[in-house]
């Protein structure tokens, strides 16, 4: 089983929000974020996946997710590279 870290961005161009998360099934998780069952921070917005990275171990994925959540500059660099 693979583990993914992903970055979501709002579809609404007026609010420039991003969200970093972890999942083993990114598409299913995106559907939850776009419904009322997503993380509290993502409710009320429609999201698209702009970045995902695959890992073989959960611990490496969680460590990378933590680093993206704590390092805004690193996250913004990835967002700029992905357009």
Predicted regions and their residues:
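GIY-YIG nuclease catalytic motif and its immediate N-terminal context
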Residues: 1-55, 59-74, 80-83
């Amino acid at each position: 089983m693979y583990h993914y870290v992903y970055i979501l961005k709002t579809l609404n161009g007026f609010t420039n929000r991003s969200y970093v998360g972890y999942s083993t099934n990114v598409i299913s998780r995106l559907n939850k974020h776009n419904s009322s069952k997503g993380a509290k921070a993502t409710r009320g917005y429609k999201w698209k996946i702009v970045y995902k990275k695959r890992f073989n171990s959960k611990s490496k994925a969680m460590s990378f997710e933590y680093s993206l959540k704590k390092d805004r500059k690193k996250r913004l660099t990835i967002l700029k590279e992905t357009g």
